[in-house]
């Protein structure tokens, strides 16, 4: 009986440790944020990267004018919504304490109709996000740091 209770307690505690990431992925706005703005290990970070990535995400019908991809560790992005890596910024926004590697894809030409051609701008920037339940749900802007 004691062995069974100990095993149950161990499984319960392990379950608690696994719950937060699972709950985070259950948030549809956070999942949408990651889909549209997160790419851990980009290939290229050039115009071709932008055109391929935007097409894969379905952001080319109509052509989205601008989109920024954040690269690196998603835990650091989530930490912007807490004091760990973020500060209040404006009304209901948070700015990262540290810069992130990003690629911004800007639509070339004026037409929102495909084929979409993008110009890539790669760099390190502090990012501004809107948070919901300590999770980023909207990328407001990115700020170049000198």
Swiss-Prot record:
<dbReference type="GO" id="GO:0045087">
    <property type="term" value="P:innate immune response"/>
</dbReference>
<dbReference type="GO" id="GO:0030139">
    <property type="term" value="C:endocytic vesicle"/>
</dbReference>
<keyword id="KW-0037">Angiogenesis</keyword>
<feature type="disulfide bond">
    <location>
        <begin position="63"/>
        <end position="116"/>
    </location>
</feature>
<dbReference type="InterPro" id="IPR023411">
    <property type="entry name" value="RNaseA_AS"/>
</dbReference>
<keyword id="KW-0221">Differentiation</keyword>
<feature type="disulfide bond">
    <location>
        <begin position="50"/>
        <end position="105"/>
    </location>
</feature>
<dbReference type="GO" id="GO:0010494">
    <property type="term" value="C:cytoplasmic stress granule"/>
</dbReference>
<keyword id="KW-0217">Developmental protein</keyword>
<comment type="similarity">
    <text>Belongs to the pancreatic ribonuclease family.</text>
</comment>
<dbReference type="GO" id="GO:0005507">
    <property type="term" value="F:copper ion binding"/>
</dbReference>
<dbReference type="GO" id="GO:0048662">
    <property type="term" value="P:negative regulation of smooth muscle cell proliferation"/>
</dbReference>
<dbReference type="GO" id="GO:0005634">
    <property type="term" value="C:nucleus"/>
</dbReference>
<comment type="function">
    <text>Secreted ribonuclease that can either promote or restrict cell proliferation of target cells, depending on the context. Endocytosed in target cells via its receptor PLXNB2 and translocates to the cytoplasm or nucleus. Under stress conditions, localizes to the cytoplasm and promotes the assembly of stress granules (SGs): specifically cleaves a subset of tRNAs within anticodon loops to produce tRNA-derived stress-induced fragments (tiRNAs), resulting in translation repression and inhibition of cell proliferation. tiRNas also prevent formation of apoptosome, thereby promoting cell survival.</text>
</comment>
<keyword id="KW-0964">Secreted</keyword>
<dbReference type="GO" id="GO:0004549">
    <property type="term" value="F:tRNA-specific ribonuclease activity"/>
</dbReference>
<dbReference type="GO" id="GO:0050830">
    <property type="term" value="P:defense response to Gram-positive bacterium"/>
</dbReference>
<dbReference type="GO" id="GO:0005737">
    <property type="term" value="C:cytoplasm"/>
</dbReference>
<dbReference type="InterPro" id="IPR036816">
    <property type="entry name" value="RNaseA-like_dom_sf"/>
</dbReference>
<dbReference type="GO" id="GO:0005604">
    <property type="term" value="C:basement membrane"/>
</dbReference>
<keyword id="KW-0539">Nucleus</keyword>
<dbReference type="GO" id="GO:0004540">
    <property type="term" value="F:RNA nuclease activity"/>
</dbReference>
<dbReference type="GO" id="GO:0005102">
    <property type="term" value="F:signaling receptor binding"/>
</dbReference>
<keyword id="KW-0963">Cytoplasm</keyword>
<feature type="binding site">
    <location>
        <position position="127"/>
    </location>
    <ligand>
        <name>tRNA</name>
    </ligand>
</feature>
<dbReference type="GO" id="GO:0043066">
    <property type="term" value="P:negative regulation of apoptotic process"/>
</dbReference>
<keyword id="KW-0732">Signal</keyword>
<feature type="binding site">
    <location>
        <position position="105"/>
    </location>
    <ligand>
        <name>tRNA</name>
    </ligand>
</feature>
<feature type="active site" description="Proton acceptor">
    <location>
        <position position="37"/>
    </location>
</feature>
<dbReference type="GO" id="GO:0009303">
    <property type="term" value="P:rRNA transcription"/>
</dbReference>
<dbReference type="GO" id="GO:0005730">
    <property type="term" value="C:nucleolus"/>
</dbReference>
<dbReference type="GO" id="GO:0005615">
    <property type="term" value="C:extracellular space"/>
</dbReference>
<protein>
    <recommendedName>
        <fullName>Angiogenin</fullName>
        <ecNumber>3.1.27.-</ecNumber>
    </recommendedName>
</protein>
<dbReference type="GO" id="GO:0050714">
    <property type="term" value="P:positive regulation of protein secretion"/>
</dbReference>
<keyword id="KW-0346">Stress response</keyword>
<dbReference type="GO" id="GO:0071425">
    <property type="term" value="P:hematopoietic stem cell proliferation"/>
</dbReference>
<keyword id="KW-0255">Endonuclease</keyword>
<dbReference type="InterPro" id="IPR023412">
    <property type="entry name" value="RNaseA_domain"/>
</dbReference>
<feature type="active site" description="Proton donor">
    <location>
        <position position="138"/>
    </location>
</feature>
<dbReference type="GO" id="GO:0008201">
    <property type="term" value="F:heparin binding"/>
</dbReference>
<dbReference type="GO" id="GO:0001666">
    <property type="term" value="P:response to hypoxia"/>
</dbReference>
<feature type="disulfide bond">
    <location>
        <begin position="81"/>
        <end position="131"/>
    </location>
</feature>
